[in-house]
Regions:
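Peripheral, non-AAA+ core regions of ATP-driven protein-machinery
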Residues: 4-14, 18-82, 89-95, 102-109, ...
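P-loop (Walker A) phosphate-binding loop of NTP-binding proteins
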Residues: 99, 127
Length: 457
C-alpha cells in the first residue's frame, strides 16, 4: 500500500503569502524567487484557539483599561532606552537582528543583569549555548545576580510550560531560528517553524504581560532570516550594525509601535561587554587627519540626536576604460546623482575620473542633509584643496544645484558649537531659525557654487 504523501504548501519568504504551487513572482509583494516549500501547518497551534492566556474574550471599554501596570522598565542603558522609546513596555515583543558576533546576546545579557539586580524575574532561554557557556560569557561582562534564571531548551512546548509556571517579567529567546514546535512537521529555522513559534510566544507575551526579546539571525542581504511576516508580528524590530572587526556598534530601530524609528544607540565593544557612547559626534570624529583634501565634517540627525561625521572623498584619473565609482556608508545612487549635479551645474569635470566616497568610522547615513558635505568633499579632492578643520556643513542639494533647507537646523548648529567648530555653511532658508545662536559664524548659501567658494576661505 502506497504511503500517504504529506501535503505541502509554498510560502513567500518576503511577505508570508501562501500558495498551493510554486510561483516565480509573489502576487502579494511582487518579489521574484521567494517561494519555499514547507509542510502544511494547518491544524497546528495556529488553529487551536487564539485566545491569549489571562485575557477574557469580551469587549472592554477603553476608559476601563488601567495603564498603571504598563509602566516602562529601564534597561540600565540610556542608549537602548532611547531606541526603545523610553524603556521596555510590559507585554511587548522585541526582535533584535544583526550579523554573527555583533553583540546581540551580549547586550541582552547585560540588560538581564540590570533587571535581575533591580528585583525583576528574568528568564534567559538559549537554544545555541550550554549553561556553562552562558556563565562564561556572563563572567566576562561582570557580576550577575544569582536570581537570573537560565534555561537551555529548544522545544517550544517545554518553554511555554516553564514561562506559564515562572511568569517572568522579562524573557529572552536566543534565538528564534533554533526553536522547535512539535506540532509543525518541518525543521527548526524553516518558514513554518519560525512563524508558528513566534505566534505562540506572542500569545504568551501579550496574555501574561511578559516583555519578550527575540534574537533573530540575518541573511546575507542583512534582513532577519525567515518569513517577512515575523517582523509584522512583533512590536519592535531593532538591528545591530557595525563592523565586527571594529569596536563601535550602532543599534537602529526599523519598527516601533511604542516610539520613534529614527533614533539610534551608539555602543563600543570592550572586553567587559558593550559600553554606551554618550557623545557619538566626538567618537566619530576621533582620528580625523589634519590638512587633508577630500575631507569635510557634516551633520546628520537621527531622531532627535545630531551626529557629526567625517565625509571622505577621493577623486583620481581612471585607470581603465570605464570610471570606477564606489560609496561606502551612504547611498551609491545618491552619490552618482550629486556627481552629475557637479558636472552640469558647477563645471567640475568628473566623467573621466574614478571617485570613492566614504563615511568615516563605518557608520551608515543616508540623510539628504549630507548632500552638501558629499559635494564639497568631492570638489576638495578633485581640486586638491583643504577645507578648514573648524568648518561644518549641511544641506540638501537639488538637481538645479540649489541648496535646500533641512529639518532641525538649530540642533545641528548647536552640536557644532559644542564641539568647538567656528564656522557652519548652511542653507539660507534655515538662517532665520539659527540666527540667534552666538559664538559661531553662520554662512548661508543658496547654491552649490556659493558653498564651494565659501569652503575655500
Amino acid at each position: 500500500m502506497a504511503a500517504i504523501k504529506k501535503k505541502t504548501v509554498f510560502f513567500c519568504q518576503n511577505c508570508g503569502y501562501e500558495s498551493a504551487k510554486w510561483m516565480g513572482q509573489c502576487p502579494g509583494c511582487r518579489e521574484w524567487n521567494t517561494f519555499v516549500e514547507e509542510p502544511d501547518a494547518k491544524g497546528s497551534s495556529s488553529k487551536k484557539g487564539t485566545r491569549r492566556p489571562g485575557e477574557a474574550s469580551k469587549p472592554v471599554r477603553l476608559r476601563d483599561i488601567s495603564m498603571e501596570e504598563h509602566r516602562r522598565l529601564g534597561t540600565g542603558m540610556k542608549e537602548l532606552d532611547r531606541v526603545l522609546g523610553g524603556g521596555i513596555v510590559r507585554g511587548s515583543m522585541v526582535l533584535i537582528g544583526g550579523d554573527p558576533g555583533i553583540g546581540k546576546s551580549t547586550i541582552l545579557l547585560q540588560v538581564c543583569r540590570h533587571l535581575a539586580d533591580s528585583g525583576f524575574c528574568v528568564l534567559y532561554i538559549s537554544g545555541e549555548e550550554s549553561l556553562q557557556q552562558i556563565k562564561m560569557r556572563a563572567a566576562r561582562i561582570g557580576e550577575i545576580s544569582d536570581d537570573l534564571l537560565l534555561l537551555c531548551e529548544t522545544n517550544l512546548a517545554d518553554i511555554k510550560e516553564i514561562i506559564e509556571e515562572q511568569k517572568p517579567d522579562v524573557c529572552v529567546i536566543d534565538s528564534i531560528q533554533t526553536m522547535y514546535n512539535e506540532e509543525v512537521a518541518s525543521a527548526p529555522g524553516s518558514v513554518s517553524q519560525v512563524r508558528e513559534s513566534t505566534n505562540v510566544l506572542m500569545m504568551l507575551a501579550k496574555g501574561l504581560g511578559v516583555s519578550m526579546f527575540i534574537v533573530g539571525h540575518v541573511t546575507k542581504e542583512g534582513a532577519v532570516a525567515g518569513p517577512r511576516v515575523l517582523e509584522h508580528m512583533v512590536d519592535t524590530v531593532l538591528y545591530f550594525e557595525g563592523d565586527r572587526h571594529a569596536s563601535y556598534r550602532i543599534l537602529r530601530g526599523v519598527k516601533n509601535r511604542f516610539g520613534s524609528t529614527n533614533e539610534i544607540g551608539v555602543f563600543e565593544m570592550r572586553g567587559s561587554g558593550l559600553v554606551e557612547v554618550e557623545n557619538p559626534s566626538e567618537y566619530m570624529l576621533s582620528g580625523r587627519p589634519e590638512d587633508a583634501s577630500g575631507s569635510v565634517v557634516a551633520c546628520s540627525v537621527e531622531g532627535t540626536r545630531p551626529v557629526l561625521i567625517e565625509i571622505q572623498a577621493l577623486v583620481c584619473q581612471r585607470n581603465f576604460g570605464i570610471p570606477r565609482r564606489t560609496a561606502t556608508g551612504t547611498d551609491y545612487n545618491r552619490v552618482n546623482l550629486l556627481m552629475a549635479v557637479l558636472e552640469k551645474r558647477c563645471g567640475v569635470a568628473l566623467g573621466a575620473c574614478d571617485a570613492y566616497v566614504n563615511i568615516a568610522g563605518g557608520i551608515r547615513m543616508n540623510e539628504p542633509a549630507l548632500d552638501l558635505g558629499i559635494l564639497l568633499a568631492l570638489v576638495s579632492s578633485v581640486r586638491d584643496y583643504t577645507i578648514p578643520d573648524d568648518v561644518m556643513v549641511f544641506g540638501e542639494v537639488g538637481l538645479s544645484g540649489e541648496v535646500r533647507a533641512v529639518s532641525q537646523a538649530e540642533n545641528r548648529v548647536q552640536e557644532a558649537k559644542r564641539l568647538g567648530f567656528h564656522k557652519v555653511i548652511l542653507p539660507s532658508a534655515n538662517m532665520n531659525s539659527c540666527r540667534r545662536i552666538e559664538g559661531i559664524e553662520l554662512v548661508p548659501v543658496k547654491a552649490v557654487r556659493e558653498a564651494i567658494a565659501e569652503s575655500k576661505k
